[in-house]
Amino acid sequence: MSRRQQRVEELIRREIAQMLLRGELRDPRLSPASAVSITGVGVSGDLSVARVYVDVLTESLRRDDVLDALVSGAGVIRTKLGERLQLRRMPELRFEADQSITRGARVEEILSELRDSGELE
């Protein structure tokens, strides 16, 4: 992965996270915005596509609803990114669920249960 790809990924991740925190995306499915986490961004080699990985940190929001809201607002998000970032061509945004945080928490829960039962030393 090139240095430029990494820089573009980080810029897109940071800007989308800021949009969510500032409430710039006026969709009730994204509220509270602090519960929506942009866990990562991956851009294609030609910078034409950016995969944005999203996780929901609370039970009050449904992951599918959040993804639907982001997909339906992808055009607005892309336009706002175009205004803020100095890129020749703004990548197409594709939002995907990132369940790594949820899976990690589940592994921790299982390990804790095993420690409590004495099966894990």
Name these PLM-found stretches:
Residues M1-V49, D55-E121:
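Charge-rich, low-complexity N-terminal segments
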